[in-house]
């Protein structure tokens, strides 16, 4: 009732639009709205299954038929039908795999990971929770937790293992692993996390938006497991070169290899469905028995191919259990040489070292060109080994 007020067409048009929308049964469909809905529909339909395209094609055709006699209400219903059919589209199996791999690669590329070596040194559940708290606060994405690295500091409720045509009783395996861990380092703060504690840690990390990447290292960094195998009756599981290794398994000892695969498989079974990635190590082969020349020794003795087969078998095992396989970089195409063996391209390479004097590793560029995803964990920048 104020004729002196300034006329604003935007306000009038908005009111006209609202009235038309409110009385959609009496107004003709808005062609711009229809065109927008059609433009948002996918056009490359080769990625979808024929079955799921039936409803989508019919809904799109119906919307394309909107004309001067179609009301807004009818058009709105047709648009809703098209959107529902679009949401119900199903990728073909091959394209779904391609999308999943792309998403996993993007997630890995954006990962911000804190790595805790809870194999060498015991970390309590409370300590690990506090680390998770800080990781969440700072915006980290994952906790990489080495539970088997020199020591073995995570024990499942049931450690029964089937290998070498025999059954290794749960209590015997637990006792042997505990003895091996104490032989490596008898930590006064504790020895190993229980399954209940790991369950709680994973649930807690999930609640804080932190994923968990478990690691059980082999065939190197196996000090505790090597002692355990001997206690369980497996003779001479250690690799022997200049001296007998305290850390590394002999890849020609089938009894030791079978036991180790059964043990790692046990942990993979536990972590499947709880973690996306499983790191099985494979770094620093027999460095203590070769003056850090273990990879050269494997090549000299024509055993490098056996190492590649071992690494690939663990990758296949992880994949079968729904886990992405991860391994450290130094043993993979050592010295950039691809002539001694081929590694599974599904192995995510945790690139922890660029090498040192006489320890010559493949470049990250080569590994990427050979099809591997790379997680940058360069120890020269990030690695701190606590001495106390």
Model features per residue range: what roles?
Residues 250-348, 352-372:
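Active-site neighborhood of glycoside hydrolase catalytic domains
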Residues 101-119:
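N-terminal small/glycine-rich loop or linker at the start of catalytic domains
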Residues 1-102:
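Beta-rich interaction/scaffold domains
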Residues 121-135, 360-363:
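Short, acidic/polar
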Residues 127-151, 271:
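Catalytic domains of carbohydrate-active enzymes, especially glycoside hydrolases
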Residues 106-110, 150-207, 222-258, 286-302:
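Aromatic- and acidic-residue-enriched carbohydrate-binding clefts of CAZyme catalytic domains
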Residues 112-116, 143-145, 212-216, 278-280, ...:
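Hydrophobic faces of well-ordered beta-strands that scaffold small-molecule active sites
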Residues 138-140, 197-219, 245-279:
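An active-site-proximal structural segment forming one wall of the substrate-binding cleft
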């Amino acid at each position: 009732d104020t004729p002196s007020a300034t006329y604003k067409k935007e306000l009038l048009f908005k009111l006209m639009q609202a009235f038309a929308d409110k009385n959609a049964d009496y107004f003709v469909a808005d062609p711009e709205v229809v065109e927008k809905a059609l433009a948002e529909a996918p056009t490359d339909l080769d990625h979808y299954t024929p079955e799921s395209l039936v409803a989508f094609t019919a809904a799109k055709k119906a919307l394309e038929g909107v004309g001067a006699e179609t009301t807004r209400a009818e058009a709105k219903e047709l648009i809703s039908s098209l959107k529902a059919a679009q949401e119900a589209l199903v990728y073909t199996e091959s394209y779904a795999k391609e999308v999943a791999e792309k998403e996993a690669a993007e997630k890995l590329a954006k990962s911000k990971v804190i790595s805790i070596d809870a194999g060498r040194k015991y970390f309590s559940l409370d300590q690990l929770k506090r680390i998770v708290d800080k990781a969440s606060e700072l915006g980290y994405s994952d906790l990489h937790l080495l539970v088997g690295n020199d020591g073995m500091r995570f024990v499942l409720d049931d450690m029964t293992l089937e290998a070498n045509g025999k059954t290794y009783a749960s209590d015997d395996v637990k006792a042997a692993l505990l003895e091996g861990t104490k032989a490596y380092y008898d930590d006064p703060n504790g020895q190993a996390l229980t399954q209940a504690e790991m369950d709680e840690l994973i649930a807690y990390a999930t609640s804080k938006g932190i994923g968990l990447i478990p690691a059980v290292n082999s065939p190197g960094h196996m000090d505790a497991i090597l002692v355990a195998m001997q206690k369980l009756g497996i003779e001479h599981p250690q690799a022997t070169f200049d001296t007998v290794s305290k850390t590394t398994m002999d890849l020609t000892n089938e009894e030791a290899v079978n036991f180790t695969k059964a043990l790692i498989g046990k942990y993979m079974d536990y972590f499947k469905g709880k973690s996306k990635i499983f790191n099985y190590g494979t770094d620093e082969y027999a460095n203590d028995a070769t003056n850090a020349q273990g990879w050269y020794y494997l090549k000299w003795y024509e055993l490098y191919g056996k190492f590649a087969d071992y690494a690939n078998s663990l990758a296949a095992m992880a994949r079968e259990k729904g886990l992405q396989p991860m391994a450290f970089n130094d043993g993979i195409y050592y010295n950039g040489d691809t002539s001694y063996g081929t590694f599974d391209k599904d192995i995510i390479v945790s690139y922890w070292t660029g090498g040192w004097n006489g320890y010559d590793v493949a470049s990250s560029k080569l590994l990427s060109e050979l099809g591997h995803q790379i997680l940058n964990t360069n120890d020269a920048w990030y690695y701190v080994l606590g001495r106390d």
